[in-house]
UniProtKB/Swiss-Prot annotation:
Listed result of changing residue 61 to R: Increases kinetics of Fe-S formation on IscU
Family: Belongs to the frataxin family.
UniProt-listed PANTHER family: FRATAXIN, FRATAXIN, MITOCHONDRIAL
Name of this protein: Iron-sulfur cluster assembly protein CyaY
Amino acid sequence: MNDSEFHRLADQLWLTIEERLDDWDGDSDIDCEINGGVLTITFENGSKIIINRQEPLHQVWLATKQGGYHFDLKGDEWICDRSGETFWDLLEQAATQQAGETVSFR
């Protein structure tokens, strides 16, 4: 994968997250902000999830209250380089815990 393809795929990931949060109809207030390649999700309780792209490594990084995760694209899924879990699974687990209610991005 070259840099432009990586950015296209990361942009697509950011857009999906932003669209899902725009459509969010849960009880919790969840905000999303994108600034310079960093996507920050802020929850009503003040906690945050931060997602950023690491261009030199062609990775997406996810920082949550539970820890930090690094994802490589394998096929059509972003996969954690330590646990083998998908980006969406880990994001949903963290968002659900931090929101205090079920959050789905799929």
